[in-house]
Amino acid sequence: IEASLKLFRKKGQPHLFDRLACELYPTYLRHAPFRVLLASRYGLLHTDPLTRGVTAVMESYTVTSGRRVTGERFSYWDRSSQCLYLAHGPGHLYRLDGDTVHEEVNGAGPVVFLPIEHDIAQPDIGPHGELAGALVDDLQYATETGSGILSAADQRLLFLSWILACGFGNRLPAKPLLLMEGDHASGKTLALQRVQAALTGRTLPMTIGSKDEEDFPTMLLHETPIAIVDNQDTPIEWLRDAIATYTTAGGWRKRVFYTRTESLWIKPQAFIGITTRNPATYRRPDIADRCLLIRLAHRSVQGSPERILANVLEKRPRLYGEWLWMLNRIVKLMRTTEVTENFPYRMVDFAQMVIFTARILGLDDSAAHTLLHAAQAERDELVLEDDPLLDLL
């Protein structure tokens, strides 16, 4: 075991790194991949007392001698080297330094990626000019928005900026909440599913109910980088508080199953996209102030969702490859641009992302600032929508 495994502490919890598969596992016997590893490679069955003794020694070693490591599920921005790391299947990752996209072995740098369930595609990296067309440009954006000044072009730039921000999970500790509002048959769910398919190779919208409060943090944790909350039309009181915690870079402390005293700090890095016809849940000022509103109109011509998603999956190597190329352009801007702290906007990190996105598209900074002002006006309008006192006045 010592020859093929390396023991770490990740957020205070014992983990082992498999040198052969380049994968990180928590050393809990209730964790199925860890049990499979012990049984298949070393003949240690989880019911054998010897196995429990071995895992106890592993956990003891990690507490006294284990090296601390950052463990992530999808992406990691390293502030010291100013490089972006992205998971790429079993044992591999991408390192983006602003010039080149390097494929490297998982665990060789400052981050170790946990196993993920995404489908792996070998990307065709380059400026193909297909990403925006496949995911952003063909949506039917509403021309009559709440504020009246958020144009279709603004919404396209806003949506693309959010898609690119999904690659910088820990770089944006306070994450914007994408709120996609539209009537039936406006394509709001499909719009988010296409993004999820392009980045992860699968689609998994979630429906949140009144009894899902305990599971919500874990659901977000596993749906990195994008969690789709679908058709959230009925206000749920606990969801307001959970969303407020999420948008302010908070987290949740949860007790480890089958223990009385062990706990884990859950801080999801997923970007949440919510589809709704009634955004009443998100009109609370501390939530609305961190929302990105995309308003879609009814589509007169409907296509087959299955065929549309299949087309995205077919093009995924080029779409994902262009996404990586655009992320690398942003990394270069991050490394060479002095970031100002005097933005007149909330969510300064995301505001900077909008400016970088505009630049790599060849737009002037004024286009980004116009969008950011319009987006703030739209958030202000969201708080006041359907306010009976305002109607009375």
Task: Outline where the language-model segments fall.
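AAA+ P-loop NTPase catalytic core and its hallmark functional loops
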Residues: D241, T245-R253
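Well-ordered alpha-helical segments embedded in enzymatic catalytic cores
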Residues: L158-W162, A242, E322
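P-loop NTPase catalytic core of nucleic-acid-dependent motor ATPases
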Residues: T100-E223, V354
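Feature primarily recognizes SF3-like P-loop helicase cores of small DNA viruses
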Residues: P173-P176, R202-D241, R255-I274, P279-L393
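Catalytic micro-motifs at enzyme active sites that drive phosphoryl/nucleotidyl and oxygen chemistry
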Residues: S4, T70-Y76, S81-L84, I163, ...
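A structural signal for short, well-ordered beta-strand segments and their strand-loop junctions
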Residues: Y85-A87, L179, L293
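N-terminal nucleic-acid engagement/recognition segments and initiation subdomains in replication
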Residues: I1-G126, D154, M219, W325, ...
